[in-house]
């Protein structure tokens, strides 16, 4: 199987943050026997992320994104994954409850903007994130081109 990593964040693209996640992801893929063919970094722009994901789905079986699934307006990975996989972005009350529970577990109240994290591509499988508040997810391409696994970015 061919794998690809897509690192998302303008701060990564411009060198303002060191990309430590890509190295860990590359090592983890190697350890489970997946061949990493490409690693791309793209800024926080829905159109460009969608373009990168479409190319990745054309040439790889497993795409792992890191970044852009937080609560701010520049966190547009969810929509870009939905676009690239041919799915609608839908609101999940279950995910909203999970995000709220995560905040309660760390003694904080969930802010209104954190509800953005309850959007997910239709049919995607939510994945737990024990380290943060952003729900991760796995989305299968509607056309059968591959899967996209979306993980949080560099803190």
Where would I find each of the regions flagged by the language model?
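Glycine-rich phosphate/diphosphate-binding loop of Rossmann-like nucleotide-binding domains
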Residues: 1-39
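Glycine-rich beta-strand-to-loop/alpha-helix junction loops that act as flexible
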Residues: 8-10, 65-73, 152-153
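Short beta->alpha junction loops
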Residues: 38-48
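Short catalytic-loop micro-motif centered on adjacent basic/acidic residues
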Residues: 38-40, 65, 150
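An anion/phosphate-binding loop that grips the pyrophosphate of nucleotide cofactors and donors
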Residues: 60
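Proline/glycine-rich low-complexity loops and linkers
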Residues: 76-155
